[in-house]
């Protein structure tokens, strides 16, 4: 069994690999629980990189949820523009998020669209109870 970080390859990994391979300029992708536990990662990410990206995405999404509860509405997607690219986090399912890193050449509209499609495909099937990795269920 191939591993690209501390967890064995699972059903989420191949979806993330597909996203990275299909969408130009996406370099990394991670599914995570809202409390920062990595649930799946694209190829090429070691344990430290996966855990770091998941922790950053969790903190970023927490800020977005706080802002949206203060100002109204739900936090759907948050974007940080850096000189080297973009960091994008989207709510994915109950208690989960999708985070991607891109290069600066990325078409953010296309990336956001592809993330939304992936979230639509998986969001209803992802259920995570906080503080436990074993709480991930993929239902049919």
Map each language-model feature to its residues:
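Acidic, low-complexity cytosolic segments
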Residues: 1-28, 35-140
């Amino acid at each position: 069994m191939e591993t690209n970080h501390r967890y064995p390859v699972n059903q989420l990994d191949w979806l993330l690999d597909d996203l990275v391979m299909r969408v130009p300029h996406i370099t990394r992708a991670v599914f995570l629980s809202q409390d920062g536990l990595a649930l799946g990662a694209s190829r090429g990410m070691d344990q430290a990189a996966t855990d770091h990206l998941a922790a950053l995405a969790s903190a970023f999404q927490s800020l977005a949820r706080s802002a949206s509860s203060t100002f109204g509405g739900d936090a759907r997607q948050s974007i940080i523009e850096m000189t080297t690219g973009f960091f994008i986090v989207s709510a994915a399912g109950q208690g989960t998020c999708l985070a991607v890193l891109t290069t600066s050449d990325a078409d953010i509209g296309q990336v956001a669209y592809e993330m939304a499609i992936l979230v639509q495909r998986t969001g209803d099937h992802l259920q995570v109870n906080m503080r436990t990795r074993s709480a991930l269920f993929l239902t049919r």
